[in-house]
């Protein structure tokens, strides 16, 4: 765990939301002295992480105005979402980003290399195809979901986003650790 002092720099703001009440409460407590930090719990349904959630992920509207952020970050979010939910969250990221704004998101991207490594038993997650999905557990797909690389451009273009640089491949499927466990996608809002 590393500590930085970026929270003492007061230009701008940091706004976050999550479906994990305990995580939000921790952030609210530890960042309370810094008025430019704001965290809120959202009661969004997720079969794995928040099965009693009252708001559908496909209908959730981020609690922020249009064009309000320079940067958005979503770590280990799309790895637990169904395709229609991913589409909505990408649309929402696009909506809240300013023109030219960027986002860093993580995902499990399924391509030929990942499929070969999973088939060879090198992956930390035993993904398998179930219908249109590539999941760890067919009974609770939201436990871990991979996005087909061939579908990624469609998701992004439909949301008005594009990749801003190459995908930084993660080590989840047995690749050497280079950048991260999950695949890193740097996105940019289209003008």
Task: Report the location of each language-model feature.
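Class I (Rossmann-like) S-adenosyl-L-methionine-dependent methyltransferase catalytic domain
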Residues: 1-5, 10-61, 88, 102-191
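A short, conserved alpha-helix within the catalytic core of class I
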Residues: 53, 81-92
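A short glycine-rich, Lys/Arg-flanked "PGG" loop and its adjoining helix->strand segment in the class I
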Residues: 65, 87-99
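Local beta-strand N-terminus motif with an aromatic residue
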Residues: 69-70
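A conserved beta-strand element that flanks and buttresses the S-adenosyl-L-methionine
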Residues: 73
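Short catalytic micro-motifs in class I SAM-dependent methyltransferases
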Residues: 76-77
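Short glycine-rich, flexible loops that bind phosphorylated cofactors or substrates
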Residues: 80-81, 112
């Amino acid at each position: 765990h590393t500590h930085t002092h970026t929270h003492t720099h007061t230009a701008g703001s940091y706004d976050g939301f999550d479906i994990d009440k305990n995580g939000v409460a921790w952030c609210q407590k530890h960042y309370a002295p810094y008025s430019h930090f704001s965290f809120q719990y959202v009661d969004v349904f997720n079969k794995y992480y928040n099965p009693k959630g009252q708001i559908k992920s496909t209908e959730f509207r981020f609690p922020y105005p249009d064009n309000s952020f320079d940067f958005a970050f979503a770590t280990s979010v799309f790895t637990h979402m169904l395709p229609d939910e991913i589409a909505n969250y990408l649309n929402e990221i696009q909506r809240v980003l300013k023109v030219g704004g960027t986002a860093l998101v993580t995902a499990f991207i399924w391509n030929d290399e990942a499929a070969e490594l999973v088939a060879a038993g090198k992956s930390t997650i035993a993904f398998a195809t179930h219908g249109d999905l590539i999941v760890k557990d067919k009974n609770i797909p939201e436990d871990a979901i991979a996005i087909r690389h061939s579908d990624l451009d469609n998701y992004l273009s439909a949301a008005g986003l594009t990749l801003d640089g190459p995908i930084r491949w993660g080590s989840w499927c047995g690749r050497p650790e280079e950048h991260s466990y999950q695949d890193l996608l740097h996105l940019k809002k289209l003008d």
